[in-house]
Amino acid sequence: MVLIRVLANLLILQLSYAQKSSELIIGGDECNINEHRFLVALYTSRSRRFYCGGTLINQEWVLTAAHCDRKNIRIKLGMHSEKVPNEDAQTRVPKEKFFCLSSKTYTKWDKDIMLMRLKRPVNNSTHIAPVSLPSNPPSVGSVCRVMGWGTITSPQETYPDVPHCANINILDYEVCQAAHGGLPATSRTLCAGILKGGKDSCKGDSGGPLICNGQFQGIASWGAHPCGQSLKPGVYTKVFDYTEWIQSTIAGNTDATCPP
C-alpha cells in the first residue's frame, strides 16, 4: 500500500514538474512583490546577510525554525530587494523567544520551531501583514509555495537580492523516509518537494514559510545537500501540530507544552 502511494506521488510530482519547470528557488524565479507580506528575514548585528527566514503571524509574533536561533537577532519586515528597501520596511528585535523544550533541543524530525515576540509590534502596511495559522493540515498532493532569500545555486552559493519562490507538492511522509535515512516511523513534519528535482528550499531559506492553498502549513527545516536533487524532497516542521502551543504561548501561558 505504501509503495502504491509513493508511486502515485511520483506521478503527481512528475506532472507538476512538467507544468512548472521554470519555477525554481535553485536558479529560479523572483517572488511577486505583493505575495509575501508575512515573510521576514533574519540576520545578526554582526552580519548583514540574511541567514534564515521567518513568518509574521500577528503584529507582535514571528514563527521560525529553532535551528535559526542566534544571539543578537535582527528581524527585517516588509522587505523585497535588499539593495532598494521598500519605504515601509521595518526592523525589530525579539523581546522573548520560546521553544518547545527548555533545553532548546530539537532534531531533524522533531520540534524544530521557535516563536519570537517582537520588542515592538508592527502595523499592517503595503508590504507588511501577518498570515493566519492553519485551520486544517495539508493533504498529500497539495500545491504549496516555498520562498526565501536563500541561495539559488547549490552546492556553490549565490544569494539573490530579492526573495525567490517555487511551487512544490506535499508528499507522503514515507517518501522522505525512503529519501533520508534515520527518519522515525512518524514525526510532526511535512515532506514536500519535486521528486524529479530542481525545486527546493536551500541554505538561507530555513525558517521560512511553506504556504499551501493560502495557509501557513510548514517551516523550512532541512533537506539534502546539494539542494534540489531528484528523489530528495525537503522536510518542513508541520505548523498545524503546534497551533495549540503557539496560541497558548501568545495568550501568556509560558508553561504551555508542545505535542509529544
UniProtKB/Swiss-Prot annotation:
Expressed by the venom gland. Residues 19-24 form a propeptide. Gene3D superfamilies: Trypsin-like serine proteases. GO terms for biological process: proteolysis. Its EC number is 3.4.21.-. Residues 1-18 form the signal peptide. Pfam families: Trypsin. The keyword Lyase does not apply. The active site is at H67, D112, S206. Residues 25-251 form the Peptidase S1 domain. Keywords: Disulfide bond, Glycoprotein, Hemostasis impairing toxin, Hydrolase, Protease, Secreted, Serine protease, Signal, Toxin, Zymogen. One of its GO terms (molecular function) is serine-type endopeptidase activity. One of its GO terms (cellular component) is secretory granule. It comes from the Eukaryota. Its main location: secreted. It is found in: Secreted. SMART domains: Tryp_SPc. Belongs to the peptidase S1 family. Snake venom subfamily. This is Snake venom serine protease gussurobin. The lineage of its organism: Eukaryota, Metazoa, Chordata, Craniata, Vertebrata.
